[in-house]
C-alpha cells in the first residue's frame, strides 16, 4: 500500500484488513482504497472492504500500466505498482465504486468459477478429438464428466442464490421472456452486466467491448475495431446471435443478411449484430425498469 509517500504491506485476509482499517481510521481526511482488478484475489479484497465499510475503487490494470509508461516509469515491482495505482487514482480523480450487495458479489464469484470450468471443458473436448492414446482418451473423458458435474452444481447454486433476492429473480425472469436469451445468458447478464438498463447505447457498447473505434492517421483510414470489454458477455451474445440467425424473419437475421450482401466479412457482420442485440437489450431493460418503478 502507498499512502502519503510511505509503503506498507497488509495480508489479503481478515486480520490484514483489520490493520488496514485501523490505519485508515487514524487519518484526518477520507481515504479511498484503489486497487487493480486481478480476478478472485481482488474480489476477496472487495468483499472484505465492503464488510468493513471502506470506500474502494477497482481500476483497469492496463490503464494503470499505460499511465506508468506515459510518465516514464518502466520498472515493475510491488512497491512501484502500488505507487502508480495511487498516483493514477489521484490524477484521474477516481470515484468510489457503487456499493454492490453481498449477493451480487457472490454471484460474480460463482460466475467466474463457472466460466473457468466451461473453458477447461471446452479445451478438454478439443484435445479429445485429436487424441489417439486410449489411456489419455479415458482420462480426458473422466475430466470432462467431472467438469460437467461441477458446472451443473455451480449453476444450481446460482439459481438458489438468485431466488433469495426478489429483484434478481424478477430480472432473471424478465430476461428469459426475451427472444434469444436463454438461462445461461440471463445468469451472466445479472452477474456480469448489472448496469444493463442504466446506460445509453454508446456507454453499454463500450463497456462490453462492442463499440467500434477509429484507427486513422493522416490520409490513412484504418479498419474500425472493437477491443477490451467483458469477454464473457461477448461470448454469450455471439451464441445468442447465432441462435437468432435461425429465425428468418428476425430483425437480427435481416441485418446480418444486409451486411453480408454489402460484402462485409462474417465476423464484422456478427459483431454488428451482437452490438445491435446488446443495445436492444439495454433499451428494453431500461423500459422495463421504468415501468416497474412507476408501478
Sequence positions of predicted segments:
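Acidic, carboxylate-rich catalytic segments that either coordinate divalent cations
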Residues: 248-295
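Long, charge-rich intrinsically disordered scaffolds of nucleic-acid metabolism proteins
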Residues: 47-50, 57-178
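Acidic beta-strand-to-loop metal/phosphate-binding motif
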Residues: 30-38, 85, 241
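Short, solvent-exposed helix-loop connector elements
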Residues: 95-108, 132, 221-224, 254-271
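Gly/Thr-rich phosphate-binding beta-strand-loop-beta motif of the actin/hexokinase/Hsp70
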Residues: 1-3, 85, 187-188
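Phosphate-backbone recognition surface of nucleic-acid-processing proteins
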Residues: 15, 183, 187-262, 266
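Acidic, metal-coordinating catalytic cores used for nucleic-acid/nucleotide bond scission
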Residues: 34-45, 225
Amino acid at each position: 500500500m502507498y499512502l502519503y509517500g510511505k509503503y506498507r504491506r497488509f495480508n489479503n485476509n481478515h486480520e490484514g484488513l483489520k490493520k488496514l482499517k485501523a490505519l485508515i481510521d487514524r487519518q484526518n481526511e477520507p481515504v479511498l482504497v484503489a486497487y487493480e482488478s486481478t480476478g478472485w484475489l481482488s474480489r476477496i479484497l472487495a468483499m472484505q472492504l465492503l464488510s468493513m465499510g471502506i470506500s474502494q475503487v477497482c481500476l483497469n490494470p492496463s490503464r494503470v500500466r499505460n499511465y506508468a509508461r506515459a510518465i516514464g516509469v518502466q520498472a515493475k515491482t510491488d512497491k512501484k505498482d502500488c505507487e502508480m495505482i495511487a498516483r493514477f487514482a489521484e490524477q484521474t480523480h477516481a470515484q468510489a465504486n457503487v456499493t454492490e450487495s453481498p449477493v451480487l458479489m457472490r454471484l460474480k464469484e460463482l460466475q467466474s468459477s463457472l466460466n473457468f470450468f466451461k473453458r477447461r471443458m471446452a479445451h478438454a473436448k478439443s484435445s479429445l478429438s485429436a487424441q489417439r492414446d486410449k489411456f489419455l482418451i479415458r482420462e480426458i473423458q473422466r475430466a470432462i464428466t467431472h467438469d460437467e458435474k461441477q458446472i451443473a452444481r455451480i449453476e444450481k447454486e446460482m439459481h438458489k442464490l438468485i431466488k433469495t433476492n426478489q429483484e434478481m429473480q424478477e430480472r432473471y425472469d424478465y430476461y428469459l421472456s426475451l427472444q434469444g436469451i436463454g438461462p445461461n445468458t440471463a445468469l451472466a447478464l445479472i452477474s456480469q452486466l448489472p448496469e444493463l438498463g442504466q446506460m445509453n447505447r454508446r456507454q453499454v457498447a463500450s463497456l462490453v467491448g462492442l463499440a467500434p473505434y477509429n484507427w486513422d492517421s493522416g490520409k490513412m483510414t484504418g479498419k474500425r475495431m472493437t477491443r477490451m470489454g467483458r469477454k464473457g458477455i461477448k461470448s454469450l451474445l455471439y451464441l445468442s446471435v447465432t441462435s437468432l440467425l435461425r429465425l428468418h424473419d428476425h430483425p437480427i437475421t435481416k441485418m446480418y443478411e444486409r451486411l453480408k450482401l454489402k460484402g462485409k466479412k462474417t465476423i464484422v457482420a456478427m459483431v454488428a449484430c451482437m452490438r445491435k442485440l446488446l443495445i436492444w437489450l439495454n433499451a428494453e431493460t431500461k423500459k422495463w425498469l421504468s415501468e416497474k418503478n412507476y408501478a
